[in-house]
Amino acid sequence: MRWRHPPAVVAAPPPAPVDAERLLRRLEWRVLRRLDGALHGDYRGLLLGPGDDLADLREYQPHDDVRHIDWNVTARLGVAHVREYHEDRDLTAFFLVDLSPSADVGAHTSRASVALEFVALMARLLTRRGNRVGALRYRRSVDAIVPAGGGRRHVLRLIHTLSQPSAAARAAPARAGTRLHELLEAAQPLLRRRSQVFVLSDFLTEPGWEKPLARLAQRHEVVAVRLTDPLDGELPDLGLLLVGDAETGEQILIDTGDRGLRRRLSRAVEQREAALQAAFGSAGVDALELSTDDDVVEALTHFVRLRRRIGARRDGEAGGPATGSAPRGALS
């Protein structure tokens, strides 16, 4: 019988504070430009809120951008029509970031690193358009709050705060699981106006988060960014293996070659996946799955196009104008 310590599936120490300026500069030059190109600067379906409200439908003119043609209305009327939108730049977005110990685990890079890059990218995209961003961080508890603000300097502050070590995490009981509902409930009093909310988590959490998520979605535009890893649903055949729970610190010795164990794990993964999708759908929340081995530009581009396609199909069937936004929960 083989015995190995898995190098990729054990929990790593919490990441050290990042160089916020270096990270943001890299994202601006290498990622944000690619995203601009992939979406042609049109972020409807990703950045929601007042700035996406449909203002008017009118006949197409030679100078109009063909990307704004409403093909459903055009087909019904037989004349090309374009959509015009309100240019409301006063959108507020909040990032609710679950960096509990399981976020420090990953096959090649950690979920925490992926989450931080996503927040930095989206925060800069939003502030570049004149919007304001804020954040809450959860490790063992909600231990960091960044009030909403605008501008590049504010984004640097936000990145720096989220990446700082947590004194509360060190003081918390070692055998406590994630309580995502605490993060969702802590956000409620901070969001006094309709906002864009990104909930970043692996959703490996204790029960009770579904209702707080639904309450958030009743007042705000919520996207669940589910942080995953290629090893989440796989059990490598490595013989006897000592595995640990990143949340509680508990360890157990298992035989990864046991077919019965592998079948039970597969069923558990399928059941958990179905439960998550049902919870997102019930809450009316669209979910973006972001793996540690994903290209973030490709993931975001696919998400945006899918939301637009679903939204256009819904509005076409209803006989109304397509707004480019998906119905809530349609992607779950």
PLM segments and residue spans:
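Exposed, interaction-prone extracellular/peripheral surfaces
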Residues: 1-46, 59-64, 73, 82-120, ...
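N-terminal low-complexity, intrinsically disordered segments
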Residues: 67-77
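Acidic, metal-associated active-site segment
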Residues: 56
